[in-house]
Amino acid sequence: MDPNCSCTAGGSCACPGSCKCKECKCTSCKKSCCSCCPVGCAKCAQGCICKGASDKCSCCA
């Protein structure tokens, strides 16, 4: 698994929760690259943690 999660710039993240992205360029989650974050979540860049298999994360819930 690529630790940097090379997401397409401006695209949506599809990285697993176990992936610690360092260079994710997704607009939805710039830092943590959480797949559970909705598009347009302004708090994702602060670092979010996906809650299990749910579609919510700690910063966007």
From Swiss-Prot:
- Give binding positions for a divalent metal cation 2: 7, 13, 15, 26
> Mind listing the UniProt keywords for this protein, alphabetically?
Acetylation, Metal-binding, Metal-thiolate cluster, Phosphoprotein, Zinc
Which residues are noted in the entry as a divalent metal cation 6-binding?
Answer: 37, 41, 44, 60
Return the annotated region ranges for Beta.
Answer: 1-29
Q: What is an annotated GO biological process for this record, any one?
A: cellular response to zinc ion
Q: Where does a divalent metal cation 7 bind?
A: 50, 57, 59-60
> Which residues bind a divalent metal cation 3 per the record?
15, 19, 24, 29
Residues that, per the record, bind a divalent metal cation 5: 34, 36-37, 50
Entry's transmembrane regions = none
* PTM annotation (Phosphoserine): residues: 58
Q: Which GO terms describe its cellular component?
A: cytoplasm; nucleus
Which family does this protein fall into? Belongs to the metallothionein superfamily. Type 1 family.
UniProt note: domains: Class I metallothioneins contain 2 metal-binding domains: four divalent ions are chelated within cluster A of the alpha domain and are coordinated via cysteinyl thiolate bridges to 11 cysteine ligands. Cluster B, the corresponding region within the beta domain, can ligate three divalent ions to 9 cysteines.
How is this protein named in the record?
Metallothionein-2
Gene source species: Stenella coeruleoalba
Name of the encoding gene: MT2
